[in-house]
Amino acid sequence: MLEQMGIAAKQASYKLAQLSSREKNRVLEKIADELEAQSEIILNANAQDVADARANGLSEAMLDRLALTPARLKGIADDVRQVCNLADPVGQVIDGGVLDSGLRLERRRVPLGVIGVIYEARPNVTVDVASLCLKTGNAVILRGGKETCRTNAATVVVIQDALKSCGLPAGAVQAIDNPDRALVSEMLRMDKYIDMLIPRGGAGLHKLCREQSTIPVITGGIGVCHIYVDESAEIAEALKVIVNAKTQRPSTCNTVETLLVNKNIAYSFLPALSKQMAESGVTLHADASALAQLQTGPAKVVAVKAEEYDDEFLSLDLNVKIVSDLDDAIAHIREHGTQHSDAILTRDMRNAQRFVNEVDSSAVYVNASTRFTDGGQFGLGAEVAVSTQKLHARGPMGLEALTTYKWIGIGDYTIRA
């Protein structure tokens, strides 16, 4: 089965690579329109997935990721339309010039070819990834989690129908709908057909891909994100950022999971934090020093377990640790962070500059929420993933991250001397 999917995707990629920006946008507009026109079918499929997931004991955080509503589905369709408005990087000349030999040489952006994406219970990923791949002239093979099998199948049928109505092969966007985990291992060895693999899931999936894949892998999306409250931070303003970073949508990978508080501001900051977190329904997991100050406050507080500093809660839970200084905060982030998104809240710009220079994450913020690490917020459109590695892409992966380049030499029957 996968062999045939690979062949179909490879053949489709040759066709997609020849499309103009206008032709690709026409396809995307058709997909967006059909997602709305066929919304009832997709939402009914999703309702069945959610019901099964709830019956199987899936956590509330995962149920939130899985669930579609009419508003969310409309938002997904609108995101596809936003991709239409983005500049097409394919064909862009990165640099070039004329050599001494007279050969005109240029480096031009081209599609990668076929992208493979493995992801869990997030049905929006199906459309986000497909739209970005199509915009950049790439075919894609999707392998969603078993929790979203009905939703993904219904969504891909809508996308394929839109492709065919525009004269393009259905093989441009395909999904593996068999939940057999053995197929993941088989997919990881499809280097004959797949040019880049992107896993979007937990640490176990990333480890599996790194160890077994014969295809170049882009890992990321695991967000143990930190906010450091420096001793010069403005408490009221800092709390606004923390509430946003923790509670806006707790199930996302750019949500803050650990709050590091400078010891010199802890006495005045922690009572205010407790009050705010109680109002927001957040449970605090505090180290011994913070626990002593938080126990009398209104927020629910428990003693932090050492392993929780490495946890991506994806829920209304927040670690709180008192640190001695900036060096202590940076050391903690280096030990427990996932190089996703980390922030400092401070009025001391020297400390801010040190934090930016010394915290080696894909996105580092000064006096801003970690929630900004998002393709849409960065002006990249819908993202295919957030890469926490350094090759070939880093941070939110928009259109350019789905391209490579080729060298093109144009001569007049020019030969090398």
From Swiss-Prot:
Main location: cytoplasm
Keywords per UniProt: Amino-acid biosynthesis, Cytoplasm, NADP, Oxidoreductase, Proline biosynthesis
One GO process term, biological-process aspect: L-proline biosynthetic process
Any one cellular-component term (Gene Ontology): cytoplasm
GO molecular function: glutamate-5-semialdehyde dehydrogenase activity; NADP binding
Localization annotation: Cytoplasm
Keyword Ribosomal protein listed: no
Record-linked CDD domains: ALDH_F18-19_ProA-GPR
Pathway(s) this gene product operates in, as recorded in its UniProt entry: Amino-acid biosynthesis; L-proline biosynthesis; L-glutamate 5-semialdehyde from L-glutamate: step 2/2
UniProt EC number: 1.2.1.41
Residues that span the membrane, as ranges: none
EC main group: oxidoreductase
A UniProt-annotated Pfam family: Aldedh
Catalysed reaction equations from the record: L-glutamate 5-semialdehyde + phosphate + NADP(+) = L-glutamyl 5-phosphate + NADPH + H(+)
Role description: Catalyzes the NADPH-dependent reduction of L-glutamate 5-phosphate into L-glutamate 5-semialdehyde and phosphate. The product spontaneously undergoes cyclization to form 1-pyrroline-5-carboxylate.
Protein name: Gamma-glutamyl phosphate reductase
Top-level taxonomy: Bacteria, Pseudomonadati, Pseudomonadota, Gammaproteobacteria, Enterobacterales
